[in-house]
Curated annotation (Swiss-Prot):
Nucleotidyltransferase is among the record's keywords: yes
Localisation per UniProt entry: Cytoplasm
Pfam families, per the entry: Sua5_yciO_yrdC
Domain YrdC-like: 1-184
GO BP: regulation of translational fidelity; tRNA threonylcarbamoyladenosine modification
Keywords: ATP-binding, Cytoplasm, Nucleotide-binding, Nucleotidyltransferase, Transferase, tRNA processing
GO molecular function, one term: double-stranded RNA binding
HAMAP family per record: TsaC
UniProt EC number: 2.7.7.87
Reaction it catalyzes: L-threonine + hydrogencarbonate + ATP = L-threonylcarbamoyladenylate + diphosphate + H2O
Protein name per Swiss-Prot or TrEMBL: Threonylcarbamoyl-AMP synthase
Record's function text: Required for the formation of a threonylcarbamoyl group on adenosine at position 37 (t(6)A37) in tRNAs that read codons beginning with adenine. Catalyzes the conversion of L-threonine, HCO(3)(-)/CO(2) and ATP to give threonylcarbamoyl-AMP (TC-AMP) as the acyladenylate intermediate, with the release of diphosphate.
Amino acid sequence: MNNLENIVEQLKRNRVVAYPTEAVFGLGCNPNNESAVRALLKLKKRPEEKGLILIAPTKELLLPYIDENKLTAAHWQIFETPSERAITWVMPAKKAVPQYLTGQFDTIAVRLCCIPAVIDLCERTGFALTSTSCNLTGQEPCRTADEVKLQFGADFPVLEAETAGKTNPPEIRDIFTQHIFRQG
C-alpha cells in the first residue's frame, strides 16, 4: 500500500515531493507556488535560468502555461499523439508564466504523462507538477523510493510506487522544428 494521500497533502501544502515517472523518480511541487518552486531549485541546486518541465496527464492542466495562439491544430496533434517513448515538448509560454518556470526562455517544456502515480497526484491536487530528476548534484537519478530516501533522508516525502521501468529519460523536442534537445 502506498502513501498517496500523504503526498497529495504535501503538494497541497506547497512542499517538494518525490514521485515516480517514466524512467526515474522526479522532484515536483505546485508550479503555481513560487516558494515551492524556489525550494525545489534550492534542494536540487538547479539554476533558475534552465527552467523546469511541467507534466500532467491531460492537456487541460498544461494549458495555463502554453501560448495557444502560436500553435496550429497540427502542433496540437503532434503534442497529443501517443508515442512509444515519452516526449517533453518545448512550446511557447504565455507571457504571464513566471520566469522561475521558464528560466531564460520564452518557452515552457511540457509533457503528457500517463504514469498512474502522476495521474493520481494531478487528479487529486488539480494542478500539473514540476518535474526534474530526483537526485542531488553529482549523484545518479533515483529509480526507487528507497534510493530517494538514501539521497534525501528517510523523512523526505516520496510516493511509494514504481516508475514505468523505462531505461532512458524522456526525449525533449521543439514543437515547431522537431529539433531534439535531449535524446530519449
